[in-house]
Swiss-Prot record:
Protein name: Proline--tRNA ligase
EC number: 6.1.1.15
Annotated keywords: Aminoacyl-tRNA synthetase, ATP-binding, Cytoplasm, Ligase, Nucleotide-binding, Protein biosynthesis
Organismal lineage: Bacteria, Bacillati, Bacillota, Clostridia, Eubacteriales
GO biological process: prolyl-tRNA aminoacylation
Organism: Clostridium acetobutylicum (strain ATCC 824 / DSM 792 / JCM 1419 / IAM 19013 / LMG 5710 / NBRC 13948 / NRRL B-527 / VKM B-1787 / 2291 / W)
Length: 570
């Protein structure tokens, strides 16, 4: 591509709306442009990079034995109601009606569609296993779109669905996808970790997320540097800290005027927050749930949802709290509580003589003890924290933030049973298909590349996903010799399969260099005054070194970079 014919949309300043580097640089380099909140148009340069990521995904999925498919993005509500998920996605699902008042949605994911296809077309074990994938636009009405393509309302996703006759087959399919994902992210030069995860609304038994560590990540990851254990904070088991044994004290009701929060109670009683147990009231659909955790801990709402079998939980309003406790917010406790579930974090059972709310405005109980004073469902209901014991090896955990770029699930029979997707096995028996689901956020992966590969001057694209691989820059537009040799070099590069740019614009060399750095082209060849000596300058974007080499050796130098990156020329 000659840049004189190219739509160059570079900006010298970052738009005020952009908060993170990938968003700033994708806007500044002219990769994307905002159309509405969470909705972006891809400019030619950005689309070219996106397609490079898609092609890597496609190659690895095909190599793993998956077959490409393309489903409709406009989905009838009947399928979602059949699976029981029409309401689960709630306000995130874009719902609409046609002129005949028939309900549809814009697909946020496609389990129902692929299950519907499978029940119509897969009848026998002889057709199994099968793995189908698509690369398609998805739609989710995010409450707070932010960070450019990291959390948008319209995004490109690769989603795959495997169908097997038994769980052993599912394990094989799942492991193939795990390996394919590892290869995909390695080829894209994205440094990420596979972590244990909760299946959430997707359902099923096993799940892993591919997470990129980032300070702006919306997920928290618990990981151990000793044994390589890693899990999303939603999934990570919290190992209880056992308090020193004490003689059980007499339960006492204490007046605590104007002391509602843990901070206020710590000041009032003059003891550490570890001596308090807070009781937090939630609504889980039509049920009221109370959760007890130590005063310095946080409730893990995902664990609570799983414990009560609810698709969603939310903090109860004042009216619900008043009905459950008989008191204002801030005085809830386990003794005399009127709720459907009382969930007690297992750490509480190792505590002695702690302080809880008395279910009476202005009062708390001192010297409360589990079993003697109250009982409930004991389990793990809190978030793991920095420094606590790894559940695998016992060494201290580290907590970091991360961006999810991929997620794989063992769905089992959740959808096939709900939608009656059955096949006939070797013995002539009808059985539900065993399913797996595997997603990659294509836009997110592209953004993650930019987050991990940039400097003060712009994007530093890895060669594998760069929109263009080499840029040829004649330093002086008015120099016939420089322009002629640059054109010849550009033509030679294209002949051997290099995705090349020729900056033939009537601009100063400094402007051309700045644009080349901003858009992140991996290799730059400058045809300058040394061309009269048969020499050009060669520079890699990820290095400060400028090499002066013979013109007749520059093609070989480009080929060398492809070999270093294990890439074949087309």
């Amino acid at each position: 591509m000659k840049m004189s014919n190219m739509l160059m949309l570079t900006l010298r300043e970052s738009p005020a709306e952009a908060e993170i580097e990938s968003h700033k640089l994708m806007l500044r380099s002219g990769m994307i442009r905002k159309m509405a909140s969470g909705v972006y148009n891809y400019m030619p340069l950005g689309l070219k990079a996106l397609k490079k990521v898609e092609n890597i995904i496609r190659e690895e999925m095909n190599a793993a034995g998956a077959q490409e498919f393309l489903a409709s993005a406009l989905l009838p509500s009947e399928l979602w109601k059949e699976s029981g998920r029409w309401e689960v996605f709630g306000p995130e699902m874009f719902k609409l009606k046609d002129r005949n008042e028939r309900e549809f949605c814009l697909g946020p994911t496609h389990e129902e569609v692929f299950t519907d296809f499978a029940r119509s077309e897969i009848k026998s074990y002889k057709q199994l296993p099968v793995n189908l994938y698509q690369i398609q636009t998805k739609y989710r009405d995010e409450r707070r779109p932010r960070f450019g393509m990291i959390r948008s309302r319209e995004f490109v996703m690769k989603d795959a669905y495997s169908f097997d006759k038994d769980n052993e087959g599912l394990d094989v399919s799942y492991n193939k996808m795990y390996e394919a994902y590892t290869k995909i992210f390695k080829r894209c030069n994205v440094s990420c970790s596979a972590v244990a995860a909760d299946s959430g609304a997707m359902g099923g038994s096993g799940s892993a997320e591919f997470m990129v560590k980032s300070e702006i990540g919306e997920d928290e990851i618990a990981f151990c540097t000793e044994c390589n254990y890693a899990a999303n904070i939603e999934k990570a088991p919290a190992v209880p800290e056992k308090a020193d044994k004490e003689e059980l004290g007499e339960l006492k009701k204490v007046e605590t005027p104007h002391a509602k929060t843990i901070e206020e109670l710590v000041e009032f009683f003059g003891v550490d927050s570890k001596k308090f147990v807070k009781t937090i009231i939630y609504r889980a659909e039509n049920k009221v749930v109370a959760v007890m955790v130590r005063g310095d801990r946080e409730v893990n709402e995902t664990k609570v949802k799983n414990a009560v079998g609810s698709v969603d939980v939310e903090l109860a309003d004042e009216k619900t709290v008043k009905k459950a406790t008989g008191a204002e917010v801030g005085f809830a406790g386990p003794i005399g509580l009127d709720v459907d579930y009382l969930l007690i974090d297992n750490e509480v059972t190792y505590m002695y003589n702690f302080i809880v709310g008395a279910n009476e405005t202005g009062y708390h109980y001192a010297n409360a003890n589990y079993d003697r004073d109250f009982k409930g469902t004991v389990g793990d209901f809190r978030n793991a924290v920095e420094g606590e014991k790894c559940p695998k090896c016992g060494k201290p955990l580290t907590i970091a933030r991360g961006i999810e770029v991929g997620h794989i699930f063992k769905l089992g029979t959740k959808y096939s049973e709900a939608m009656k997707a059955y096949f006939v096995d070797e013995n002539g028996e009808s059985k539900p298909l065993i399913m797996g689901c595997y997603g990659i956020g294509v836009n997110r992966t592209m953004s993650a590349v930019v987050e991990q590969h940039h400097d003060d001057n712009g994007i530093v694209w890895p060669l594998s996903v760069a929109p263009y691989e080499v840029i040829v820059v004649p330093a002086v537009f008015k120099s016939e010799e420089q322009m002629k040799e640059a054109e010849k070099l550009y033509t030679e590069l294209k002949k051997i399969g290099v995705d090349a740019l020729l900056d033939d614009r009537n601009e100063r060399a400094g402007v051309k260099f700045k644009d080349a750095d901003l858009i992140g082209i991996p290799m730059r060849i400058t045809v300058g005054k040394k061309i009269s000596e048969g020499k050009v300058e060669f520079k890699c974007r990820n290095s400060e070194e400028v090499e002066v080499i013979d013109l007749d050796k520059v093609i070989a130098r480009v080929e060398e970079e492809f070999e270093k990156n294990n890439l074949a020329l087309k």
